[in-house]
Amino acid sequence: MAALATLPPLPPQFKSIQHHLRTAQEHDKRDPVVAYYCRLYAMQTGMKIDSKTPECRKFLSRLMDQLEALKKQLGDNEAITQEIVGSAHLENYALKMFLYADNEDRAGRFHKNMIKSFYTASLLIDVITVFGELTDENVKHRKYARWKATYIHNCLKNGETPQAGPVGIEEDNVDVEEYEDAGATSLPTQPLQPSSSTYDPSNMPSSSYTGIQIPPGAHAPANTPAEVPHSTGVTSNTIQPTPQTIPAIDPALFSTVSQGDIRLTPEDFARAQKYCKYAGSALQYEDVSTAVQNLQKALKLLTTGRE
């Protein structure tokens, strides 16, 4: 993919979107669709914040140029041309990243990759709002992921052992901005460099974990090459993708026929179509389990009128 034009310095007014733009940079090669929607979210949010100040207008104009260039490069990609496919792609990607971090957390494996995955998942759920309001489930995932990233980051920084798995969210005692501002407050101008996965709060990357590479397999598309650091003599945490467990299919679904008294609404058909799109997107990631679950949901909805 051709390099995009460089953005001007980020205006202070746009501090709230700097991490979404950084996430876009990180995904330019890994997943251009994700990168595109991160920039689209930043553009829409930036327009709401300040579209009149000269420096903001200049920044948004350059960002629009990037969006147009990306859209041209992606061509006929259905995740760009069809909103429902794009929504499914982005939601599945965010969920994969969330589940990777959640599995590491529940196993008591606390490291920068996991912290970064939790936080990036929360940012990507922000981005899903370009398609409309979030579901209650996504709102809960975003809140939990952002809190977990901050909580574990603070524990490791203070030399404490985080509590694994779900714990009560005490948002009043956690400063999310402390995690966001752990590094530089401006967008990185140099190419992203991989870093060791050894956690050292006194030696954090200047771009707030920008250099952390997330191994594919846990959440990334199967054809995404791993961008791992060359051997540096530092022991790193190698994450092995867990074997997929295909959910058991309820045999009753195959024998169920739509009864005459079942009346499906347009909303039912739209939800069924969405589940099928989610299944198709999951298969792009070779995620059979998620694909089967979504197809089962669609089949149940169409045959029973219930979810």
Swiss-Prot record:
Lineage of source species: Eukaryota, Metazoa, Chordata, Craniata, Vertebrata
Region described as Interaction with CHMP5: 2-75
Record's bilayer topology term: Peripheral membrane protein
Pfam family membership, one: Vta1_C
UniProt-annotated stretches for the region Disordered: 180-240
Biased composition (Low complexity): 185-198
Primary gene name: VTA1
Family the UniProt entry places it in: Belongs to the VTA1 family.
Functional summary from the UniProt entry: Involved in the endosomal multivesicular bodies (MVB) pathway. MVBs contain intraluminal vesicles (ILVs) that are generated by invagination and scission from the limiting membrane of the endosome and mostly are delivered to lysosomes enabling degradation of membrane proteins, such as stimulated growth factor receptors, lysosomal enzymes and lipids. Thought to be a cofactor of VPS4A/B, which catalyzes disassembles membrane-associated ESCRT-III assemblies. Involved in the sorting and down-regulation of EGFR.
Keywords: Acetylation, Cytoplasm, Endosome, Membrane, Protein transport, Transport
N-acetylalanine modified-residue sites: 2
Localization annotation: Cytoplasm; Endosome membrane
Endpoints of the signal sequence: none
Entry-linked InterPro entries: Vta1-like, Vta1/CALS_N, Vta1/CALS_N_sf, Vta1_C
Complex and partners: Interacts with VPS4B. Interacts with CHMP1B. Interacts with CHMP2A; the interaction probably involves the open conformation of (polymerized) CHMP2A. Interacts with CHMP3. Interacts with CHMP5; the interaction involves soluble CHMP5. Interacts with IST1.
BP-aspect Gene Ontology terms: late endosome to vacuole transport via multivesicular body sorting pathway; protein transport
Biased composition (Polar residues): 199-211
Region Interaction with VPS4B, annotated ranges: 198-307
GO cellular component, one term: multivesicular body
Interaction with IST1, as annotated region: 2-187
Source domain of life: Eukaryota
Name this protein carries in UniProt: Vacuolar protein sorting-associated protein VTA1 homolog
